[in-house]
Structures are given as structure tokens and as C-alpha cells.
Amino acid sequence: MLIEVDLPADFPPPRVPREPIARNLRDIIPAGKGRVDKAEYLARLRRGQRAGMRSLLTLMNTEHSHDWRRPTVVCIVGGGPSLAEEVGALRHLIKRGEKVLAVNKSHDWLLQPGLRCDYAALLDPKEWVADYIDLDLAAAKSTRKRAGKFWAPPKYLIASQCHDLVLEKFKHRKEAYMWHAAAGLGESEILKTEFADELWVNIAGASVIGLRAVGLAHGLGFREMHLFGIDGSMKPAADDSSPKLYAYDKPHIDKTWKAFEVKLTSGWRRAFMANHHMARSVYEFEDSMRDWDRQIKAGKMEPFSLRVHGNPDYSAIAMVAAGMGVHAAAEENETYGKAPPKT
């Protein structure tokens, strides 16, 4: 897949000229190390480890099924605009008894109408993330019976890189668990030497929590994953609305808008609009898919399946997923897996 970028771009609507500048998005928006520098990242790692929360390691493989014919299933729910159109598919999986891992404000989006939420994960280091989760929502629905299934309050998976306000909010809660976002900055060496007698776990992956959650889910033991609201792009404006980067309101939105074009190896190409970190997530999704495949083939990772839900017309990750044959809709995989019709 080649991702081409046209800079600068008008907004709205997304625009790519007839002859776009063929520059790989990796060169324009390089892989990030997060929103804090190395010194602050490692300082937060130490503070997080000392916060007193239980380690996520104590939950590892708790969702593992010993029946290979029936792998445990999880729905990873992000906040992309396609989420609003995929509620029916999500409800179907929940009704079937499948579990849900929410990221960021999706926790509240799920609980407000009474949908299931078993896990909620946070990673972003900014202070406003402390307001992403309303703990009163979970408390008001401590045990619910939905679709014949009993389910318990969410478990909160908090990255050590989160802001101190986030740690303060969760550090005394028995249902909160600490993990570290691996970034290749020497964090493993620090944990091994300074916290040798303590439990800890590093989770590698993409820079956005929606994709890093795949590693979290795999560590918990899930072997079939459905991604909802993981788009990497915005939904263009309809006649009576504004463009949408999220399915719900967020108080802080990065408005570094870029127009970019995704070109699949099958020949399909389409323009999308996103901000920096969302655009980065598109190529991180492709890179992650290839990395997981290499690790599985090398015997370093247990096999798992992944399905992406979303409309490829405006969801860049859904389009890439369809081109790689992992879209939840078989017809989308068939469409984007072959050359587009000639016009």
C-alpha cells in the first residue's frame, strides 16, 4: 500500500489533485513516541509503577479459551465516526455474549445506553484524559443482566504514561490495573533493574490506544477481535452537518488536518481527511498487521483473528483492512481485493 500526501490541503472537503505529490505518509508524519519527551516518559513509567495499582500481569490470559474451536471474542470499541453506523453489529456480538474493551470515552458511550463494557483502556498522556471516564456510570450499573448474560463492572487498564490526574483517579480502585506502553526507550531495562521484585508488563504496539488495545486484548487471552470505530480518518460533512472525526463529542481535538490518499495494491485509491495522529494510525495499522503475521509465523505470538468494522468510503483503516482481507464484511474484502472497475 502506498499512501500519498498532498500538502497543504483545503478543508472541508477532502481534496487530492489529479497528480498528487507521491510522498509516503511515513516521511511526512513519522512514527511518534507519544506526546511527552523521553525523560518525562521514563519519569511517568517510574511513577506509574510506584502508584500502587495491581499489575495487568495478574489478568494475563484470564480470558483464554482452551477450546481452539471456540476462541474467546472481544469487541474493541474506539470513537471513530463509523462507530455510529455499526451499533447493530456491535449489539449483535454483545447479545451473543462477547466481551467489550472500550478505549477513551467509548466507556461512557457504551454505558450510557446500557451496553456492555468489560474493560476500558487509557494511554494518552494529556491531563484532560482524566475526564474521559465517568466512574459513576459504572457504579450505577454494578451488575446488569443483558441478553440473558450477567456481567460485572469494567476493569480499567491504565498505562503508566497517563497524566498524574489519571493515576490519582484510578490508583486506589481495586478494579484498576497498571501496564506500560513499550516504546523502545529503555523502559524494560529500568523495570528489570529498579522493580525486579515487582510485577509489571510492557505492551507493544501502535501509537494510538485503539490499535495498542489489540496487544492488550491478546495479552488478556482473546483470540478473535472485532474493531469498531477505529477509522484513522473523518467522515465528510453531510448536507446538514459538520465533518466528524469522532462518533461522540470530545473536549480536545487535534486540528492538524491533512488530506491524504490511500492506494491499495489492488489499484483502489481514495482520498481521506484526518489529523496527524489519526493519519499515522492508518500506516501503523498496516505495519501492525504485517508485524503480527511475522511474529505468529516465527512462533513468538499465538495466532488470532481480527475483523474491522466500518465504511471504507470514509474509514481509511476499514479500506486498508478490506484490501488485506480482514474487513468484517466479506463483500468489502472481495471488492477491494481486486482491481476497481474501469471508468
Task: Describe the residue ranges of each PLM region.
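Metal-ion/cofactor- or nucleotide/acyl-coenzyme-handling active-site neighborhoods
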Residues: M1-T343
